[in-house]
UniProtKB/Swiss-Prot annotation:
SUPFAM superfamilies: Nucleic acid-binding proteins. It comes from Nitrosospira multiformis (strain ATCC 25196 / NCIMB 11849 / C 71). It is found in: Cytoplasm. This is Translation initiation factor IF-1. Keywords: Cytoplasm, Initiation factor, Protein biosynthesis, RNA-binding, rRNA-binding. Its main location: cytoplasm. GO terms for molecular function: ribosome binding; rRNA binding; translation initiation factor activity. Component of the 30S ribosomal translation pre-initiation complex which assembles on the 30S ribosome in the order IF-2 and IF-3, IF-1 and N-formylmethionyl-tRNA(fMet); mRNA recruitment can occur at any time during PIC assembly. InterPro entries: NA-bd_OB-fold (IPR012340), RNA-binding_domain_S1_IF1 (IPR006196), TIF_IF1 (IPR004368). PROSITE patterns: S1_IF1_TYPE. The lineage of its organism: Bacteria, Pseudomonadati, Pseudomonadota, Betaproteobacteria, Nitrosomonadales.
Length: 72
């Protein structure tokens, strides 16, 4: 079975929460809960409030996202 396509969006980190979780404000104004992807965790990429990030949303739960990239 093929996986469902993810929705990629741009956002900004609003606040840091425990367990590598962040509150992210998307371009369209929605606020979602985001967690760091495994590769970002492996390479110790730090994310701070105010950073611009790319997130992946699944069609199943649009209130949670996976943070896949931090803009420089």
């Amino acid at each position: 079975m093929a996986k469902e396509e993810t929705i990629q969006m741009q956002g900004e980190i609003l606040e840091t929460l425990p367990n590598a979780t962040f509150r992210v404000k998307l371009e369209n104004g929605h606020i979602v809960l985001g967690h760091i992807s495994g590769k970002m965790r492996m390479h110790y990429i730090r994310i701070l409030p105010g950073d611009k990030v790319t997130v992946d949303l699944t069609p199943y739960d649009l209130s949670r996202a996976r943070i896949t990239f931090r803009a420089k």
